Amino acid sequence: MTILNHTLGFPRVGLRRELKKAQESYWAGNSTREELLAVGRELRARHWDQQKQAGIDLLPVGDFAWYDHVLTTSLLLGNVPARHQNKDGSVDIDTLFRIGRGRAPTGEPAAAAEMTKWFNTNYHYMVPEFVKGQQFKLTWTQLLEEVDEALALGHNVKPVLLGPVTWLWLGKVKGEQFDRLSLLNDILPVYQQVLAELAKRGIEWVQIDEPALVLELPQAWLDAYKPAYDALQGQVKLLLTTYFEGVTPNLDTITALPVQGLHVDLVHGKDDVVELHKRLPSDWLLSAGLINGRNVWRADLTEKYAQIKDIVGKRDLWVASSCSLLHSPIDLSVETRLDAEVKSWFAFALQKCHELALLRDVLNSGDTAALAEWSAPIQARRHSTRVHNPAVEKRLAAITAQDSQRANVYEVRAEAQRARFKLPAWPTTTIGSFPQTTEIRTLRLDFKKGNLDANNYRTGIAEHIRQAIVEQERLGLDVLVHGEAERNDMVEYFGEHLDGFVFTQNGWVQSYGSRCVKPPIVIGDVSRPAPITVEWAKYAQSLTDKPVKGMLTGPVTILCWSFPREDVSRETIAKQIALALRDEVADLEAAGIGIIQIDEPALREGLPLRRSDWDAYLQWGVEAFRINAAVAKDDTQIHTHMCYCEFNDIMDSIAALDADVITIETSRSDMELLESFEEFDYPNEIGPGVYDIHSPNVPSVEWIEALLKKAAKRIPAERLWVNPDCGLKTRGWPETRAALANMVQAAQNLRRG
């Protein structure tokens, strides 16, 4: 029984973000569709070849996406919302972009589809929309075309397809309500057709992703798997693929399915591989997800070998990444600024492929000598002074309940804040960032490269902050921001100023569409050597009589949007960050900043996938936020911002944050998120986002007024704020000015009654 290896997917964007650049050039009208498609072909060919050269046996095909793989699946099935359809009923790449962005080089603009987090990762998918009586047919043949490409290049191909039950689970019903699971029988013929086409091409194995099987699904959804897979059996071998958690709780459902193999995540799941081996049908292949696809740490291959060796030779076995390598940067070898010690601790996507090749070879040969050599840096790291800071550990151990309590309750604080700020009804503000123009990016890049000295850099940043204040005063906003010209990324910026983090040059991962992020890496205990945001906040406040918000990224979000350590708990990391940022709140307050926003957009996404594990996470997540904020005085107003969230199942925890004002993303969901706050009788102030910043479309005054009136039916008007959904970093100034002018006008109209 020869053991093979494979990956579940590979990063799409390219080492230098070639896909992002090609997408944005096409959207701006600076390149043709043919040029965009050519970049995709080139990236796919390069990535297949890189994996093959690194020693991967079975190459994933179908993991590439022009915007998002869930959206690709929606198009495959002919699931195109009416507002995004071409007049002739055809589907093309611009259809896909209209669903994702609200507009494309061709076709009429329309509201983009809702976007939300992919399970508990920092990747986003476009939510499929379902309407009653919907029809499905094979419409978008990207998967088949890419399989043909890979076969023509001589590769050993394993197509990747998002499974039918998970795809339905990820979607939402629009309009008249019905059970979306009732659509399952309508989409299965399309899946049958796709599998038949793959069989015609000589494909042996298809990776069919059903990550919903790691969730605590309702029984009706679990029951749907058997008839669905009965309908799909027989044409090719199916590798039922799960990730992000273990499968043991749903194993009875899984083992009843007519598939030929199962992939399990042995990094994030608690499954015992020997127990799995005993319970799986003896003729099934087991794909062991041993290499973490979601982090950057070198694997302890000695430990991985020990985890799997007892079933070697007892069943067909593949070794694999735990999940798609989409969530990992591409190549560590191009990182020239990391020192040798730290660099030796990491493995990016290509290095993970090498790990899989090494593990496969050792499992096949039985010669384990190479494993100890590979794992040696991991042993050295355990004793490194770069990792452990006794002062941080001592401060963390000394935290008391009092450290997470504001001095007084919200009602007392609100009175003090009203007296201090004297804001009008329907106060207007933005979420923090303003457009990151070419001039701003060039300024930062020149400074980073040493082409600009510190004085000239600071003069340039100060001028952009001044312009942001002028723009906001001209627009008539009530609470201002400094615009964050000095910040490349809301997490990276803080990580750069905190001890315990390191950074990469090219460690890009896709967040959504063309948006890429370069997460910091937490390598050790976290502390704040000096104030981070105080100087620029103080300068911005000196330019205006209106309040300017201090802007911090919260501890849970910094944790969730970084690559965390694996040698301590996430709770420990979050509380270390909270203590560092607590000092920042105190310093902002001392500098005269009266409104401080602590963004926690990632609070919900950090939830464990199983509800039974939620309480413990929410307890320490809320405590971390409160440790961060509780140092503030009564008349200092603490804001928090959350996006892409569904709140109704965590409202107790949202209220427990005890922020004075919460701003949330609601425009894409047509204010439906406010139902949670209404039903809970949320006591503090709320700013429901009134327009979608992910789309370049400018909302009308009437549209914004209508949303605010809808909000006021759920939340008392005296507790409502008026703001966009999210930061404006990715937008241009023309649409930003137009949208904010309409937003301010809508608020003024409502004040007049």
UniProtKB/Swiss-Prot annotation:
Positions that bind 5-methyltetrahydropteroyltri-L-glutamate: R17, E18, L19, K20, K117, R515, C516, W561, E605
Requisite cofactors: Zn(2+)
Annotated L-methionine binding sites: I431, G432, S433, E484, D599
Catalytic residues in the record: H694 (proton donor)
EC number(s) per entry: 2.1.1.14
Family the entry assigns: Belongs to the vitamin-B12 independent methionine synthase family.
Name the record gives this protein: 5-methyltetrahydropteroyltriglutamate--homocysteine methyltransferase
UniProt organism field: Shigella dysenteriae serotype 1 (strain Sd197)
UniProt lineage: Bacteria, Pseudomonadati, Pseudomonadota, Gammaproteobacteria, Enterobacterales
Gene (UniProt): metE
